[in-house]
Amino acid sequence: MTPSDFISIDYKTLTKAQLKSYIDDLAEYLGEQSYLYHTIDKPVITDSDYDKLFRLLQDLVDDNPQLKPSNSVLDRVGGEILAGFETIKHKKKMTSLANVFSLEELRDFYDKIEYDIELECEPKMDGLAISIFYKNGKFDYAVTRGDGIQGEKVSENVKTIRNVPLKLNTSNPPEELEVRGEIILDKQSFLSLNEYMQTHENKTFANPRNAAAGSIRMLDSKVVAKRPLKLYSYGIGYFSKDFVHPETQFELMNLLQSFGFTISDNMFLAKNFSEVEVYHHKMSHQRADLAYDIDGLVFKVNNIKLQDTIGYTARGPKWAIAYKFPAEEVESEVLNVEFQVGRTGAITPVARLKPVAVGGVIVSNATLHNINEIKRKDIRVGDRVIVRRAGDVIPEVVKSLPQYRKPDAQMVEMPTNCPVCDSAIENINDQAIYRCTGGWHCQAQTTERLKHFVSRKAMDIDKLGAKLIEQLVAADLIKYPADIYKLNFEQLTGLERMGAKSSQNVLDSITKSKEPSLARFIFAIGIKDVGEVSSEALANHFGSLESFREAKFEQLIEINDIGEIIAKNIVSFWQDSLNIQIVDELLGNSINIQNPEKIEQAHNESFTNKTIVITGTFENYNRTELTQLLKSMGAKVTSSVSKKTDMVICGDNAGSKLTKAQDLGVEVIFEEDLQNLL
């Protein structure tokens, strides 16, 4: 299930029994996502989606309290405890804050308190929550939030953080004190760590929060000590009777600072809601300029006695609230605009941005698409801009904010020559796309073409990654695809960070790739606009590389999935003597292409020339077998439902595709119907 599967269901039309099932499923799903986020630090949905679903579950249970699921995320904070860690019970429950997502909701929170109050305001840092226990002023142990009742003991790692006091800076420390805070990695340190990780371990962290959480859970504290983690304190938990508690939250934070803890420079005391709005506006605008990642703002009733009067819910305090920023769009600043050269020579302008968190990921680059878009949006170097990142989509600059434009902001101009090889840049028929004419003579195009050639869906040389391709091209060891098959052990071990084992793995991977299917080979040689689907269609139609090389334009356009533009590109490809030479050299290096077996197409009126989508799980088929079976009967199998879909075949747990098919009036059949038709 995905967030959209839950959101797409109209729960108002459900019976009580169906609604109970829906609520239970939603609670179970949120429990799984909470575990992935809080316990193993591998979230698969965005914070924004989680917050929407949590709010939906809350609303449903508020309206139907008799349907409240037991032991759900509504009763818990965070995730379960990893089995491999010693667990320690918090002296005082480590709760979390309720969320609001608009100024209107924030105003509701303020008005409900029914007092003329001051609010202590601070950034909501996005890191790992921690509780540090001090005994007689000395560091005793540190515990993660865990499930709010007990957490993982990570004392040795937390001790390595430079700004964590090992002894409180006071001559009269309390006997016992729990200090709460957030362990973070600032944006610049995160980028530096990821660069190191990519170079030395060939992996990276998704965002600063994951980097901080992953570091604190490492077994080797010596490694943790090398990472520039920081602790920002935001409050206290348990305290012994001899602790003299300040009268206000603001004074408490100043006291913690005097003890030696780091607190945010952006704390503010709002005397009324108008000042809350001013703080909200200021921090929303300055978010991109902060050294660290924040995902919202926190507002706490300043008066401690009033906090006690207002009280708590099972999840957390009623006297504090977290305002969450919209996850999709944030402000940043364009530091520079550079032009990248792609596999086909397309020149793409890329904005170099002041690093900013968008959708849980630190973004320092964003596409500007093309020069026409830059002019239309009036984007200049030095501008404040809105940056968007949705799902796994490449970040883009949505618009500029000219009201903040500096006098020295620079217009962006398209270069006349390639920034890599200095070849001329051409613009055909005044289209938005500009291309470098250097082809294989352009190192940028060469590098990207070779990365494509070895990729998983092409020749699938899995041990020959992008970074190694860049190394090999820079060392002038490879220029054309055939050069990959000429690499030897000595050349590879001579490269930086390439040992004997790694080098042999690369050579084994290269050898393994020498018998590709015809479809993979066609895709790998990189004919413009020929993707996976087109490659498979061409391979199945022509049956051999020899037949494909001789194909005429008229033959090509008769094939499903091959339009006139692709047909022209194929003809042009085989008219280029360098392309022919590259392919011939590959064949001369023991590449043995596996031609597809000719499948006699069975005629079945139910499936021939039909566009079909398969969804769910089946008792008598796996998805791959069923796809091939339908294709053999002349069907076109696609992955998404649209108005062009003729039929959706549903197994168990069909999900949103079934719902969409029903909404569009597309024919739906189930496994029993399928067996009858076959």
Curated annotation (Swiss-Prot):
Listed InterPro entries: BRCT_dom (IPR001357), BRCT_dom_sf (IPR036420), DisA/LigA_HHH (IPR041663), DNA_ligase (IPR001679), DNA_ligase_CS (IPR033136), DNAligase_adenylation (IPR013839), DNAligase_N (IPR013840), Hlx-hairpin-Hlx_DNA-bd_motif (IPR003583)
Keyword list, A-Z: DNA damage, DNA repair, DNA replication, Ligase, Magnesium, Manganese, Metal-binding, NAD, Zinc
Domain BRCT: 602-678
EC number, as in UniProt: 6.5.1.2
One term of GO molecular function: DNA binding
Pfam families membership: BRCT, DNA_ligase_aden, DNA_ligase_OB, DNA_ligase_ZBD, HHH_2
Key word Transmembrane helix present: no
Gene Ontology BP annotations: DNA repair; DNA replication
Record's catalysed reaction(s): NAD(+) + (deoxyribonucleotide)n-3'-hydroxyl + 5'-phospho-(deoxyribonucleotide)m = (deoxyribonucleotide)n+m + AMP + beta-nicotinamide D-nucleotide
Active-site residue numbers: 124
Record function comment: DNA ligase that catalyzes the formation of phosphodiester linkages between 5'-phosphoryl and 3'-hydroxyl groups in double-stranded DNA using NAD as a coenzyme and as the energy source for the reaction. It is essential for DNA replication and repair of damaged DNA.
Name the UniProt record assigns to this protein: DNA ligase
The organism of origin for this protein: Francisella philomiragia subsp. philomiragia (strain ATCC 25017 / CCUG 19701 / FSC 153 / O#319-036)
